[in-house]
């Protein structure tokens, strides 16, 4: 939360070479870009779904090529040499951006924190896992002022080690190295973040100006932050360090802190530990008039080569630097780990003051402590200072007891900060099986751990026998398909959570999710558990099958049967190796955010859902990591299989449900059907025979979008063609296997 929230800009210069700019800091107005580009389809039709969202990182954009294997390259890396080089950079001040106290540690901590800290629990977006801080809008957020300099300082290291270390890993690793170089013992570190090569469209907020808040709060008088946002303010990581909407109220700020850190999966103790620990190092920057700070990197003149916020206040750097507009040094030891942040926080009474840039902050009252805080460049000593949000840790009952305890027990703070910092840096990386490097600690509860395989796996003969038992069990194709989808369809590609591995469909909270039809699971799971138990009790050589594997295998057997019933023999690939997690290794509260509000693949939406269903379908497809064609074929196939939630007939455009046919597409595109909104059922459409007026089908927007949206209609036409019935089956099976294996990182 070390929030150097800086300067912004007014309208852009009219010529490419014009370098003058005006800016305001710390209150930053919106950029006003001028563009001669033609209007896009989204400009003309903003409510139309954008299928291109499902293809955010095309292979052609990757200069390393499709065959590049980051894990293979990383294995060649000398991580100790890398750490030594990062620390060397950190302790070698550069004239073009001089280091406070001769050490860039505070800057690097902030860079890593602000990369990882964009993570949000409601949709798993954000985080440092792809190196997105290099690109717009994050590289130009007001909260990220001067982090462009931090990344430039690291360029010699990246240049030296090349493909063996990604930018995503290096940005996060640098902050970890900073802590260690200043005497802090970290909990561990994992590499494994792969770079992307272009920005991704993420809804960070609907405000059209920096530091805006009006669109993310409902205006009902309640300060209830809308989902899925993780920050109170457009362009900030968490909260305004001057207080809500710049009002210096530490108690109100504490409420915002709790909400935003909670949306990053941090509890109160973890939140307090991160703030205290992070603010034990470095300083903020607000040396003078913020109007003298130039435009952000994306708006800076071309000759600045991607560096932004050039300041004409004095030298613009070092003692004259302006970043957040706040001028705070928290401790007398800003390059050393100790307990002086809390000793300072509780050792003085505080009064509200303003920085040289006009930002609200607190200073020790009545001149107390004058001269005890060192100047970063050898000038006269300073008075103790704190952010409004620092005072929250003392004044708010939410955090007071926690920080008071740490004042007397610094070893507890060190342990809490080490674990919270590790969680911050790795929250978006998924299972430990994805982690690389020698410093990976034991799996933590928040990482949704699954036990290792400790037995021989089933072979092809076992798989065939188990399929026969499943199909002879009395369970129907829709039941088996829906159960497998309920397990695997919980996966989120954003933060690599959910999925079938772990068998958590049988555990709380997933067992009772409305989307998963608990009453149906109560029928299906006991049957599968009996098959599992019988096999494990009788199999030779100690072979076993987990329920997680059997759920997927059963769904795949149902798909094979459905394809056969449609006239196609096909084998659905199955890779055993999933294991069953325990309820004790499942954080119920943490998993609750994975519960789907809607799943268009099952034609499910919670009652009263107001968002357009087709948009929610697209979002679910995005989270699953499927493409436009894969989304299309999956919806059509699942409708044919009768896999709708609650057995609904919406979108089941076939007279032979349970067979894997392309009837959904054929009948959707039939011009003999005329569609209209139902007069009796909300969010339902009726398809009537155009000649007789007889009711033929019912549907939701999840179905009709494949005939309405021009891109999806083009895909639907492919699968409706007479010569593509076999292709439809093959493509459905391939997409099905992809979803079933999304969380099988051991296979990738």
Swiss-Prot record:
Record note on modification: Formation of the three residue Trp-Tyr-Met cross-link is important for the catalase, but not the peroxidase activity of the enzyme.
Linked residues for Tryptophyl-tyrosyl-methioninium (Trp-Tyr) (with M-264): 113-238
Name of the protein described by the UniProt record: Catalase-peroxidase
Cofactor(s) annotated in UniProt: heme b
Q: Where is this cross-link: Tryptophyl-tyrosyl-methioninium (Tyr-Met) (with W-113)?
A: 238-264
| Catalytic activity as recorded in UniProt | H2O2 + AH2 = A + 2 H2O; 2 H2O2 = O2 + 2 H2O
Pfam families given in the database record: peroxidase
Instruction: Report the record's Gene Ontology biological process terms.
Output: cellular response to hydrogen peroxide; hydrogen peroxide catabolic process
Q: Which organism is it from?
A: Mycolicibacterium paratuberculosis (strain ATCC BAA-968 / K-10) (Mycobacterium paratuberculosis)
Q: How is the cofactor bound?
A: Binds 1 heme b (iron(II)-protoporphyrin IX) group per dimer.
Q: Where is the composition biased (Polar residues)?
A: 1-16
Cite the HAMAP family for this sequence: Catal_peroxid (MF_01961)
């Amino acid at each position: 939360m070390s929030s150097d929230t800086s300067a912004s800009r007014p309208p852009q210069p009219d010529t490419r070479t014009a370098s003058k700019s005006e800016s305001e800091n710390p209150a930053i107005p919106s950029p006003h870009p001028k563009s001669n580009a033609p209007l896009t389809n989204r400009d003309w039709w903003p409510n139309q779904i954008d299928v291109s969202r499902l293809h955010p990182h095309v292979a052609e954009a990757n200069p390393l090529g499709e065959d590049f294997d980051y894990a293979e390259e990383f294995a060649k890396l000398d991580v100790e040499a890398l750490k030594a080089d990062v620390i060397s950079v950190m302790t070698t001040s550069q004239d073009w951006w001089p280091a406070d106290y001769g050490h860039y540690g505070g800057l690097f901590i902030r860079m890593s924190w602000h990369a990882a800290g964009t993570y949000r629990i409601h949709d798993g977006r954000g985080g440092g896992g792809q190196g997105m801080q290099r690109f717009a809008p994050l590289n130009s957020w007001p909260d990220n002022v001067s982090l462009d300099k931090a990344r430039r300082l690291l360029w010699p290291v990246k240049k030296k080690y090349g493909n063996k270390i990604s930018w995503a890993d290096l940005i996060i690793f640098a902050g970890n190295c900073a802590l260690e170089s200043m005497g802090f013992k970290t909990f561990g570190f994992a590499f494994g973040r792969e770079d992307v090569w272009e920005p991704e469209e993420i809804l960070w907020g609907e405000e059209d100006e920096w530091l805006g808040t009006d669109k993310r709060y409902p205006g009902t008088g309640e300060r209830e932050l809308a989902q899925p946002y993780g920050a109170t303010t457009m362009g900030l990581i968490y909260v305004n360090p001057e207080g809500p909407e710049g009002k210096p109220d530490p108690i109100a700020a504490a409420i915002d802190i709790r909400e935003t850190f909670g949306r990053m999966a941090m509890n109160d103790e973890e939140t307090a530990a991160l703030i205290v620990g992070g603010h034990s190092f470095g300083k903020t920057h607000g040396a003078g008039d913020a109007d003298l700070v130039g435009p952000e990197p994306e708006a800076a003149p071309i000759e600045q080569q991607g560096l932004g916020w050039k300041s004409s206040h004095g030298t613009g750097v070092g003692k004259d630097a302006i970043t957040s507009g706040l001028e705070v040094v928290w401790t007398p030891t800003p390059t050393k780990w100790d307990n002086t942040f809390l000793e300072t926080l509780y050792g003085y009474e505080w009064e509200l003051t303003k920085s040289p840039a006009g930002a609200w902050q607190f200073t020790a009252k009545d001149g107390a402590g004058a001269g005890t805080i060192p100047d970063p460049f050898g000038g006269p000593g300073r008075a103790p200072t704190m952010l409004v949000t620092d005072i929250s840790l003392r004044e708010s009952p939410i955090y007071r007891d926690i920080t008071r305890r740490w004042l007397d027990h610094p070893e507890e703070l060190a342990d809490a900060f080490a674990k919270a910092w590790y969680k911050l840096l790795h929250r978006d990386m998924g299972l430990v099986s994805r982690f690389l490097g020698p410093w990976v600690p034991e799996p933590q509860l928040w990482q949704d751990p699954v036990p290792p395989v400790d037995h021989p796996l089933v072979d092809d003969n076992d798989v065939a026998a188990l399929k026969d038992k499943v199909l002879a069990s009395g369970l129907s194709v829709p039941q088996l398909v829906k159960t497998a989808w309920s397990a695997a369809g919980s996966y989120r590609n954003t933060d690599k959570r959910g999925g079938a591995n772990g068998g958590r469909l049988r555990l709380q909270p997933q067992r009772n999710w409305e989307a998963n039809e608990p009453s149906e699971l109560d029928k299906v799971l006991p049957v599968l558990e009996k098959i599992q138990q019988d096999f494990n009790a009788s199999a030779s050589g100690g072979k076993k099958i987990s329920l997680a594997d059997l759920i997927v295998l059963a769904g795949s057997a149902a798909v094979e049967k459905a394809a056969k019933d449609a006239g196609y023999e096909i084998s659905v690939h199955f890779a055993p190796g999933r294991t069953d997690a325990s309820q004790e290794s499942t954080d119920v509260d943490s998993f609750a955010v994975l519960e789907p509000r809607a799943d268009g693949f099952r034609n499910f939406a919670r009652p009263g859902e107001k968002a357009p269903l087709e948009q929610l379908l697209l979002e679910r497809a995005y989270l699953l990591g499927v493409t436009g064609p894969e989304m299309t074929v999956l919806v059509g196939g699942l409708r044919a299989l009768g896999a709708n939630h609650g057995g609904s007939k919406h979108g089941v455009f076939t007279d032979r449900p349970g067979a894997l046919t392309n009837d959904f597409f054929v009948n959707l595109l039939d011009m003999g059907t005329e569609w209209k909104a139902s007069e009796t059922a909300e969010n339902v459409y009726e398809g009537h025979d155009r000649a007789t007026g007889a009711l033929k089908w019912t549907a939701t927007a999840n179905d009709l979008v494949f005939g309405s949206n021009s891109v999806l209609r083009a895909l639907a036409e492919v699968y409706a063609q007479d010569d593509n019935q076999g292709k439809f089956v093959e493509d459905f099976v391939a997409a099905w296997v992809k979803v079933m294996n999304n969380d099988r990182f051991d296979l990738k």
